[in-house]
């Protein structure tokens, strides 16, 4: 029930070809182009004629965290 020798050779060559193509060097640039920098963190349809569409999105809004009165971190209530 084993594979014939010619099928093993074909499968092995196909595997080697696949691995050789997968290991090729990717063409990458060292610097960001001006085209990429023009978009920035504005909305997709940002236009100088319509400044309402150019509002930046808040990524991480400020939260003060846990206060003493909430007793959620180090304060266990024991004295």
From Swiss-Prot:
Family matches, as InterPro entries: RALF (IPR008801)
Signal peptide annotation: 1-28
One GO term describing the cellular component: apoplast
Pfam families (alphabetical): RALF
GO function terms (MF aspect): hormone activity
Disulfide-linked positions: 46-54, 66-72
Main localization category: secreted
Example GO biological process: calcium-mediated signaling
Keywords: Disulfide bond, Hormone, Secreted, Signal
Entry similarity comment: Belongs to the plant rapid alkalinization factor (RALF) family.
Name the UniProt record assigns to this protein: Protein RALF-like 15
Record organism: Arabidopsis thaliana (Mouse-ear cress)
